[in-house]
């Protein structure tokens, strides 16, 4: 049994060192869910969508707004503040902390229905995050248009979580908007795979784009699903990009640079 487990883990994460695998196993054990992700090179994105049999006309439109200081103080502290408009579903918000260690989180926090601990695993690494999710307390578009305080979008519990982990002296209302990013989301269950796959296409203002394929699973099945997913995608000629960029980091960097350029031009 141990040999089978070892083979499965090796197939799921061949680029990770032994000490990383040990760390990953510990994080997965304490998480609520695992999301397996890979991004695809720009030149192969269209063929990847076609190979999975997903219909772009069924894509859901999203606008993702990030908030940080102009020099990304939150990102350096491991805090992400996001508000999102979702076609047909309404607006939602999240305050995220990463990386986290599940044993370090309080039982009260773990019991809250809006708090989720998830491991994001890519071909080249992984991170465990704690996300405080909520429904936007005001319509995002209206709130931003009239210049309402940013804190008004977030629940009392989200604001408290932010205050606990944000850099000292940086309040929610001190943050600037970075975005929004236009996102298309497609999802489906390929017959030969038997699990739901999600494709997100993030379109950046400079014409660059990231296409990410992902699937979620329970922690107990993470390595088995990772191995099966790797095989399924490989059989369809879908390979992970050598440079696995994260969507959020690229968005924050892009808009931070844009703010700096605008400031320097004044």
At which residue positions do the language-model features occur?
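Phosphate-end processing signature that detects enzymes handling 5′-triphosphorylated RNA
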Residues: 2-266
């Amino acid at each position: 049994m141990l040999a089978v487990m070892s083979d499965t883990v090796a197939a799921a994460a061949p680029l990770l060192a032994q000490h990383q695998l040990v760390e990953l196993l510990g994080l997965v054990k304490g998480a609520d869910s695992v999301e397996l992700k890979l991004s695809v090179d720009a030149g192969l994105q269209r063929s990847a969508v076609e190979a999975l049999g997903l219909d772009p006309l069924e894509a859901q439109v999203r606008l993702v707004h990030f908030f940080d200081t102009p020099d990304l103080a939150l990102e350096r502290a491991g805090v992400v503040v996001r508000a999102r408009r979702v076609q047909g579903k309404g607006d939602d918000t999240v305050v995220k902390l990463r990386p986290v260690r599940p044993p370090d989180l309080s039982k009260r926090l773990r019991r809250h229905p809006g708090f989720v601990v998830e491991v994001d695993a890519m071909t080249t690494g992984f991170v465990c995050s704690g996300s405080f999710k909520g429904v936007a307390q005001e319509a995002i578009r209206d709130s931003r248009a009239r210049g309402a305080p940013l804190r008004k979008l977030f629940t009392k519990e989200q604001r408290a979580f932010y205050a606990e982990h944000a850099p000292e002296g940086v309040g929610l209302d001190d943050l600037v908007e970075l975005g929004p990013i236009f996102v298309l989301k497609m999802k489906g269950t390929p017959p030969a795979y038997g699990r739901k796959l999600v494709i997100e296409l993030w379109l950046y203002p400079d014409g660059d784009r990231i296409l990410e394929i992902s699937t979620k699973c329970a922690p107990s099945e993470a390595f088995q699903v990772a191995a099966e997913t790797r095989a399924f995608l490989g059989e369809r000629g879908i390979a992970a990009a050598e440079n696995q960029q994260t969507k959020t980091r690229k968005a924050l960097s892009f808009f931070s640079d844009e703010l700096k350029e605008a400031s320097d031009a004044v």
